[in-house]
Amino acid sequence: MDSQKSQSSAMQIAEDMQETRAPELPGAGPVRRRTFLRGIGAAGIALSAGALVSDTVHAEEKSGSLTPGDAAILRFLAAAELIETDLWQQYAELGGLQTNEPPQITGLTTGNAAYTKALSNLDGDMATYIHDNTEDEFSHAAFINAYLKSKRADTVNLDQFRRLPSSQATGAQQIGRLTNLMELTVDTSWFTRYRSRTGNPDLGDSFANAIGVIGTKRHTAIPRNDNEAQLDPSSPNGVTDLTQFIANTAGFHFAFIEQGGTSLYAQLAQRVTNAEVLRILLSIGGTEIAHFQTWHDKAGNAPALKGVVDPVSGDTVDFPDLTTFAGNEDLQTNLIMPEPTFFLSKSFPVCSIIRPTATTNAAAATLKSFTDDGLFRGQGDDFFRYVNDLAEDADAARRGF
């Protein structure tokens, strides 16, 4: 290859490695991602493609046999799993099976009887499912970090950001949290998206919230105190309407979280280079799909409620009667398997698929969805800068780099 062609190839690689600016999170500020070309000036661009890649690998980090892109993707996934372990731990403390399984699950005590009862109205096995989902997320985070360490790549630790308050309800540990489950605005558009027979977010389509009441303003998905977790033998649900509304919100939030992981692993798998890393993403991603399918099914059992007063906001809210969705294929609760829809192009036959799976800004979009959900209300700018940086690195990854 002559020098002109070499320079042209290297410049093309540099152009290919530039990513559309990822959407910034609130509080993130003008943080620039640690691009894989950091430190390579104009003279460096004139290097051959092989030399450029070699210098990049050594300049960015010691990542063993991992490419910087694979390491960046795994780090973002480790952070996402740590965030999930934090929120699932809170659900497990209050509504899960109270069985400690070190090192994955610790700190469980008595649980919260009223909240657990309210969740059981969605399914009698909810406590077990919550416990198992929690254990799974802990195992994912621990494995990914251990794998990164084995490859001499940087790992992820979010302990410095565990600063958000805990619920004061019986069963909750009084420790710092990464996530806030008490001021959520739950996106339920996944419910209509997976029932659509013509729409696909990867093709520019948008979807309405199925449960509008929890998709506006702020709602708690765990009891904030014992006044919000009350048994009521006179109620058909065995708990107060407020406690049941909180559990209904949680039921839809469970599915929201896991549908995000379902897409994220499929999206980032398309960018990894190493076959073993691909195996990791496909293997863990499959469990996210199993989680989503479970919660999708249980959410549809949430009982109807009328005139529930939120003691914090003062709002009076109703939870819709989901049995009225019967016969409406856009909303029917038992249609939990993805309806076939357009994929890649509307010129192809419809196909039952996970959606979305397009890769552009996938990590940043995941963080934005968590932020819009209210998971990070109360977190500081330093947290947003850190996780936004991880997302930008993951989104900049390309197969082969």
Regions found by a protein language model. Give the residues of each.
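All-alpha RGS (Regulator of G-protein Signaling) helical domain and cognate RGS-like helical scaffolds
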Residues: 2-31, 41-42, 57-401
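N-terminal export signals
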Residues: 35-56
